[in-house]
C-alpha cells in the first residue's frame, strides 16, 4: 500500500534559501502574499475498508471530554478542525464547524415496514465549553435520488447534563435507497475548542420500535491511564533505581450498567503486559466495583478505587533506556452486548520526563494580566537535571503566537 506522512505547519512561516549568497530563492517567492497555505497534505484514495463507518475525521474521537459517559470513547464537536486548529481563529462569528458523515449505506432492501430506527446519545459541554443557546447539534439524512441533505433533528446548546437518548424512526421512502447517508454537524464558535457537544452509541437498525431505547451494555467509562502513584509517566532510570512504593494505592475504575435491569457482578482484572507476555496482574474486586451493591443496578455508573501498592509492579530489571508496558483491564457482567467495551487498553510510559496528566486537553488554562505567573511543582524520585519542558498550547479564540513569555525553573525553597 501507499505510505504517506502528513505534515502540518502552524503558524505559517517563510523558508529562506541560503544555499548561495546573492542568488534569488529557487522556490516560489511572493512578496506580501494575500493568501497562504498553512499545511501540507498528500491525498490518496482510501482503501475500501468494510470496517470503516465514518468518512471524515473532523469530529474528535476521544476518551476524556465527556462527563460520566456510558462507554469508552465519544465523538466531540467543537470549533477545531481535524488537525486541531481553529476553523477561523480570532473571529466572533458562528457557523457550521465539524461534520461526522457516514459511509454510503445500502438501504434499497428495506422499507418502512421493517421498522428502521436510528438512536444515539448526546451531551452538551462535558468537561469542555458550554454551548450557548444559539449553538446546536444537528442530524441530517441524505436522499440519494434527490442529491439532497435534509434536516431531521437538532438540539440547542445548554449547560451540562447527563447523556440524553434520541430515538428516531426512518420511514420516508426517499431514504430507502442504495447510497443513503446520515451526518451530524455542529453550529457554534469557529475560533477554538468551544461550544462542545459529545456523541455516543450511534445505532441504525431494523426490527426496532418506539419502545426499543435500552442500551444493553456493561462498559468501562474511562481508560485507566496509570498504575503509578502521583504520576502518569516518570523517567525509567528513576523508577528502576527505587521501584518500591511507586505503585498506586488508589487506581480509579469507572464502569456502567446501561441495561434496564440489575446484572450480576463479577471480579475484574488488570494485567501488566510486556512484549506480549503477562508480567503482573491485579484483581478488581466485585465488591469494590459495584460499591457494595448486591448487583449492578440499572442505568448506574460506579466509580471505585483499588489499592495496588502491594503485590506486582513494573519489572525494574528491564535494561532499556526507555520502557513501556501495556495495561489491559477487563470487567463484565453476564449479559453484555458490546464486549469491546468490557476491556480497556493503555500504555504506561517510562521515558525521560515526569507528567501528571493523561495527555489530553479538555480546557485551556493560563495566567492573565501583566506580570502574572503560573507554576507547577514536581517532586522527582531522585536528584537530576532539567533540560527541557513539553507544553501543549491550545490555539483558541485569540492568536497569541507573537506573545512573549518566559519559561522559569525554580529550585525547591523548602515549600
Which ranges hold each PLM region?
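Topogenic and prosegment regions of secretory-pathway hydrolases and membrane enzymes
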Residues: 219-225, 231, 264-270, 304, ...
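Intrinsically disordered, low-complexity Pro/Gly/Ser/Thr-rich segments with frequent PxxP/GP/PP motifs
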Residues: 274-317
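Beta-sandwich/jellyroll recognition modules and their flexible linkers
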Residues: 1-266, 349, 356
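Beta-sheet-rich sandwich/jelly-roll-like modules and their strand-loop junctions
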Residues: 328-414
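Beta-strand-rich binding/interaction modules
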Residues: 248-285, 403-409
Amino acid at each position: 500500500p501507499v505510505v504517506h506522512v502528513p505534515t502540518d505547519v502552524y503558524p505559517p512561516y517563510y523558508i529562506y534559501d541560503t544555499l548561495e549568497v546573492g542568488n534569488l530563492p529557487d522556490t516560489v517567492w511572493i512578496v506580501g502574499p494575500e493568501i497562504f497555505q498553512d499545511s501540507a497534505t498528500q491525498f490518496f484514495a482510501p482503501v475500501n475498508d468494510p470496517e470503516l463507518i465514518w468518512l471524515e475525521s473532523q469530529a474528535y474521537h476521544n476518551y476524556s471530554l465527556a462527563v460520566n459517559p456510558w462507554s469508552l470513547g465519544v465523538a466531540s464537536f467543537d470549533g477545531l478542525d481535524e488537525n486541531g486548529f481553529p476553523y477561523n481563529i480570532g473571529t466572533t462569528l458562528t457557523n457550521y464547524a465539524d461534520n461526522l458523515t457516514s459511509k454510503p449505506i445500502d438501504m434499497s432492501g428495506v422499507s418502512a415496514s421493517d421498522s428502521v430506527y436510528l438512536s444515539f446519545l448526546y451531551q452538551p459541554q462535558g468537561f469542555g465549553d458550554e454551548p450557548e443557546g444559539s449553538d446546536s447539534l444537528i442530524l441530517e439524512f441524505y436522499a440519494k435520488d434527490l442529491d439532497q441533505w435534509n434536516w431531521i433533528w437538532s438540539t440547542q446548546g445548554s449547560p451540562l447534563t447527563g447523556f440524553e437518548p434520541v430515538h428516531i424512526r426512518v420511514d420516508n421512502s426517499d431514504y430507502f435507497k442504495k447510497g443513503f447517508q446520515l451526518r451530524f454537524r455542529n453550529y457554534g464558535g469557529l475560533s477554538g475548542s468551544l461550544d462542545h457537544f459529545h456523541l455516543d452509541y450511534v445505532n441504525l437498525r431494523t426490527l426496532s420500535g418506539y419502545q426499543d431505547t435500552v442500551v444493553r451494555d456493561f462498559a468501562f467509562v474511562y481508560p485507566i491511564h496509570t498504575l503509578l502513584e502521583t504520576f502518569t509517566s516518570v523517567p525509567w532510570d528513576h523508577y528502576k533505581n527505587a521501584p518500591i512504593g511507586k505503585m498506586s494505592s488508589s487506581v480509579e475504575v469507572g464502569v456502567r450498567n446501561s441495561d434496564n435491569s440489575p446484572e450480576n457482578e463479577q471480579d475484574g482484572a488488570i494485567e501488566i503486559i510486556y512484549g506480549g507476555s503477562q508480567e503482573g496482574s491485579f484483581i478488581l474486586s466485585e465488591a469494590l466495583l459495584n460499591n457494595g451493591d448486591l448487583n449492578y443496578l440499572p442505568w448506574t455508573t460506579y466509580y471505585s478505587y483499588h489499592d495496588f501498592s502491594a503485590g506486582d509492579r513494573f519489572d525494574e530489571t528491564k535494561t532499556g533506556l526507555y520502557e513501556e508496558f501495556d495495561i489491559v483491564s477487563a470487567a463484565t457482567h453476564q449479559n453484555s452486548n458490546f464486549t469491546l467495551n468490557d476491556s480497556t487498553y493503555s500504555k504506561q510510559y517510562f521515558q525521560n520526563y515526569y507528567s501528571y496528566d493523561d495527555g489530553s486537553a479538555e480546557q485551556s488554562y493560563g495566567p492573565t494580566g501583566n506580570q502574572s505567573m503560573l507554576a507547577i511543582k514536581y517532586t522527582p524520585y531522585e536528584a537530576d537535571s532539567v533540560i527541557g519542558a513539553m507544553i501543549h498550547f491550545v490555539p483558541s479564540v485569540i492568536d497569541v503566537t507573537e506573545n512573549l513569555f518566559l519559561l522559569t525553573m525554580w529550585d525547591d525553597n523548602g515549600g
